[in-house]
Amino acid sequence: MPRRRGTPLPTILLLLAFVGGACGTEILSKSRLESCSHDSDAGGRLKCDRKLVVDLAVPSGASGGEASLVARVAGVEEENDTPSATKSIRDPPVITVSKSATYALYALTYLDRDVAYRPDEKYVKTHKCEPYAGAKVVGECERLWDEKGNVIKQTEPICCPCGPHRVQSKCGDIWSKLTKGKANTAHCVRFPGDWFHVFGIGAWSLRFSIRVQVKKGSSVWDVVVGPENKTVVSGDNFLRVKVVGDYTGYTSIPSFEDNYLVTPRKGTGSSQPQDLGNEHSKWMILDRVRFTLDGLECDKIGVGYEAYRNQPNFCSAPYGSCLGNQLWNFWEYDKRRIDNSQLPLYIVEGRFQRINQHPNAGAHTFSVGVTEDLNTNLLIELMADDIEYVYQRSPAKIIDIRVPTFEALSQVGIANVTTKNIGKLESSYSLTFKCSSGISPVEEQLYTMKPDEVIARSFELRSTTDQAAMHQCEAILKASDFSELDREGYRFSTAATVYNNGAQIGPTNDHKKGGFWDSIKALWRNLIDFLTGRLCWTKCPRLFDFGCHIQYVCIGWILLLLLIPAAVVFLWLLHQEGLFDPLYDWWGLEPDDDYRARRRHQKGRHHRHHHDHRHRHGHSHGDHHHHYHGGHHQRRRHHHPPAWDVEGHHHDRQQHSHEAGRNHHRGYGEVVAAGAAPLRLDRASRPGQTEVDAVVEYRERRSRHERHGGHGHRDGHYSPSV
């Protein structure tokens, strides 16, 4: 296995694997091997003949946050080779770069001045108010003394007459004036509650730190660089890192040179604060013009006793004059903005990110996070005297490809390709996974395999459509000289994207609100859609797909399939009962006469039996009217008497009616006996006449009867009809 050490190599290729928050890391230029004699003395020199130079663009994380990346030197190219070939490094160095969050640092200057959060005017209604009066007369507006017992100037009360002046007060009657003196009011300003430190803010400076770790074999080197320490060399002179600078200037870093920072006072007294604390919700940055550091201006932060006492027209001015535009006014204004989901104008919290999170934060510095995403140019130099390269070529093959089905767009698929070195030498290989369409291109992978070694490499697959599809791909394995060793095709499918609104159920467009009847109509439409199966048409397009119908409860399809045979059976039963005979007569469709005759003969026997039973029932009651009613009921129920029974039955009923008329005077019992005479049925009017002939003769007789007005045999008591 031939090797070469320290060969002049003009170009180094890097294989980058990104981790952490890095999202846009890139190689600025192809890294190179240079002579160490070119080094300057700035920051120290490397002890080597050759060095590997890597030029990187290190980005910031999201909103200027932390970021990290891993760069692995995978192979080299020699321009003198024809054709150009990439050779792998046996023990490639791995470079890990971690960049901290970027922030702007400001120097703070304490102004030896604390200000009250909310100055408050006090007043007392009294009599005989004087600037030097005691507490019995002016109450809490009595003048103040310092720790040494000296009167604090300008703390005396201001006396205003009674009446409609600064404070409305009654002057009292004459007796009160004589006994107590003239009524008046005493006014003063006091500073209760919280106090705040005031700081001047200097110019900003950019701060971040970049930690570079190089691992080669079992050895690890670490250095940390930043804007304040741009070049650092490791202790054994193996590694040197330099911050070249940022490619573009920052535009969103605020300048506070015309502002003051106020923070709540910690402890007592107004001496130099040692700790700013972390109550960022009370920190405010305000314009300098809003402050009066000597206390001589009204309506400014820091107003003092003198400005309050010496304001013009004091007694005629409104109550609380000279005490406007204080810290509490700005804080409450911002609080209302925050409650209305607006950004504050003065409060630090919510206006900036990563407040005072810089290392070694104290009372002399203040920092805010920088949200711009800018790249930092980083130059890394490694000693390259002992780098070894692998040149041999060995055959290999692809032994397995697996791609589990995944959901398009919402999921990332994994293609696992397993390769094996089937040769006798250790060699480097390149592997790629290419798909015809629908899958985004993937990056080629470089790696080394020993003889008979099996290695599985993974590729992330991302679909470019949300539809289910079948994809045709190929895994291509190449040798160290980039000649193709093996190629295997593979087909896999992706499932369609399932869209889910989560807790936000429903479409994004607004629906028009309807009234009560609109709700009823919508409910009715949904019911019709459910019963008719309209909702299932898209899921079960085939009529006889019973499994699908049951799965999606397609009641419309199921009922339709069940109603078809039920309707056929029902129509056949109606046909058996003769319900369609009038239709047959109307359309001229005559069923088999023998069949109809037999069916009507059976019905006729049933009717005669029922008629005889009704007659016997009338005799048992012995009531002629019951008999008549029974006959009438029989006529009403039997609209279609049998053809062979009509003539004989009609004749018997006429005879029965005449006999009943003649014997009516004989008595009740005789009438019943006459009515109980059995009816005779003439099946054939003439010898040799068949039942079918009797039917035809009956129809002709009935037709003549209807042409003559439909009059039958009648008497005074009973008129039977056919």
Swiss-Prot record:
Its main location: endoplasmic reticulum. It comes from the Eukaryota. It is a single-pass membrane protein; Single-pass type I membrane protein. The chain crosses the membrane at residues 553-573. Residues 1-24 form the signal peptide. Residues 598-641, 701-711 have a biased composition (Basic residues). GO terms for molecular function: lipid binding. Disulfide bonds join C36-C48, C129-C159, C141-C188, C160-C315, C162-C171, C298-C322, C435-C473. Residues 574-722 are cytoplasmic. Keywords: Cell membrane, Disulfide bond, Endoplasmic reticulum, Fertilization, Lipid-binding, Membrane, Signal, Transmembrane, Transmembrane helix. Residues 25-552 are extracellular. GO terms for cellular component: endoplasmic reticulum membrane; plasma membrane. Required for male fertility. Plays a role in pollen tube guidance and successful gamete attachment. Essential for the fusion of gametes during double fertilization, where one male gamete fuses with the egg to produce a zygote, and another male gamete fuses with the central cell to produce the endosperm. Mediates the fusion of cell membranes. Not required for pollen tube outgrowth. Belongs to the HAP2/GCS1 family. The C-terminal domain (583-705) can replace the homologous domain in the Arabidopsis protein, while the N-terminal domain cannot. HAP2/GCS1 family members mediate membrane fusion between gametes in a broad range of eukaryotes, ranging from algae and higher plants to protozoans and cnidaria, suggesting they are derived from an ancestral gamete fusogen. They function similar to viral fusogens, by inserting part of their extracellular domain into the lipid bilayer of an adjoining cell. This is Protein HAPLESS 2-A.
